[in-house]
Amino acid sequence: MHIPDNYLSPTTCAVLAVAAAPVVGLSITKVKAQLKENKELAPMLGIAASLSFLLMMFNVPVPGGTTAHAVGGVLLSILIGPYAASLALSVALLLQALLFGDGGILALGANIFNMAIAMPFVGYSVYNFFRKQNHETSGVLVGSYVGINVAAFLTAVELGIQPIIATQGGEPLYNPYGLAVTIPAMMVTHLTIAGAVEVFFTYVIYRFVKQVGPQELYTPTSVNTASFVKKIRYVLIVLVVLSPLGLLAEGTAFGEWSSEELAEMMTNVPAGIENGFSFEALFSDYTIPGTNIAVGYILSAITALLIFYILGKMIRTMNGAKVSHA
């Protein structure tokens, strides 16, 4: 679901970045207000970004030789609220693009709009509706399923309208596949396998939190994190250790191909993709020079967690928080 650079036109990227910016700005404002009431939310933002980052490393195979992954957007909304979740997801997507080349730099606004805005807010609204009817578990299941599929549908539409932008000869400049291809390709995968994976991770982690500390779940009036940070660390450790399992799924997710991969699939690569913006991430595809793939995957995960931890500490320090961690 991470759209690479040059698959969307610069105009599309700009429009989606402009659409995402005010929501991210509002999320920052809301989180600042929450931090004034509860300083312990600061480390939780880093934990939430880490959790989503790790979930997105678990690729699963899908028919057609491609892969898919969970995002954790609705899960984070349930744990720390939709605004904090949106901010944490945005930071995770930014780090993925800059450091690991997962998702484009120019397409960052689109990826934030799909995965860090539409998914957590829509999914949380569904969850909250069921919660108010005393069907919280159903809300977790349905909300996470709806959330990831809304994000997938938006991605499919954004990619599918790109063939409109073409050369005088009618050759697409950017993503070459129209809506008749992108919507079925994305939605069949996410309505079945990816949706099930998202629901599974969301439910398992939700049940873990519910059992060890039900008071830690977010409510519109409070977000309790004092003991949550300690408990969720165990989940992060397990996910880091298991992260190389994401390498078992071969192939690239639909719409996330590099120009080289696309060249193997098509006779003519669109000019906008072949000659477009190029950015070489330091640890592209979660590989570390001099290490084997599995070790590189684990080290990439640890690197991300350390960065998110430092960011959490910085936010806490800037807000004058003095939180003691056992």
Give a label for each model feature.
Residues 2-10, 14-15, 19-76:
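Hydrophobic transmembrane alpha-helices
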Residues 144, 160-231:
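Glycine-rich ThDP/TPP pyrophosphate-binding loop and its adjacent helix/strand module
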